[in-house]
Amino acid sequence: SQNSHARNGDAKNEKIMSFEAGYGYRSRFFTANLNAYYTRWIDKALYDSDTMEYKVDDVNVTDRYTLNMTGANADHWGIELDFIAKPFKWIDVTGMFSWGDWRWNGTATGYYFNSAGQIMTDFKGGIIEDMANAGDYRANIKMDNVHVGGSAQTTAALGVNVRPLKDLRISLDWNFFARNYADYDIDTSNTGLGKEIVIGNPWEIPSYSTFDLSAGYSFDFGKVRATLSGNINNLFNQEYIADARDGANHDWESATRVFYGFGRTYNVRLKFNF
């Protein structure tokens, strides 16, 4: 993540409106929860930051700029389902499904600031000198129906936990992630300060599945009780993209800051209960 200390004097208090409804079912062998939600964020304060390069008297200068924005809105709505089934005493089956539709809406406005906190007039080192003309350099960021990035909007999971012996537990979990969008990008290469910027819908990162295996065994160790357990995460070493920043063409070829997920990982634990 990135941070900025540039002051946003136009920032407003964010407002949140949320509605949620759900239903739960309970029985000896089956438990389930169904939930629906809608949340609206109003006047969210956002920022975008990157580096710029320019020349001053034939000397190369590199600086960082920040675009402070206010007035953006976001709508999140969706459904969630989770359940636990216990068909036999020695087996549990768990599952979940979540589908959401999360989008930015509205027009955010803001100024570009250099690293010194000065309002920029261009990307070549120019700064505003007469605040009476500040409105000429205010950017308007149109964000209608732009998918929120950074988190999968469709997820599912299915797990089986078996206890073949009294002190032995083995679990296998399947996890599915889809409709994860890259974070939106504001392309300054074709943007003039003070003009409207239209944000395109970002690249949809390919969906993927992973499997996790875990096991645990409890036993007596002298006069104390001990448990040996371990996990193998991403059992089949699935390659996948976890996060990215959108590019000019809204596809994998132009995406930047692409982060791949972890491959297969292991851990082993030994616990003593006194």
Give the role of each language-model region.
Residues 29-31, 91, 168-169, 223:
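Secondary-structure boundary/capping signal
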Residues 1-41, 58-86, 148-154, 204-206, ...:
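Outer-membrane beta-barrel signature, preferentially recognizing the C-terminal barrel domain
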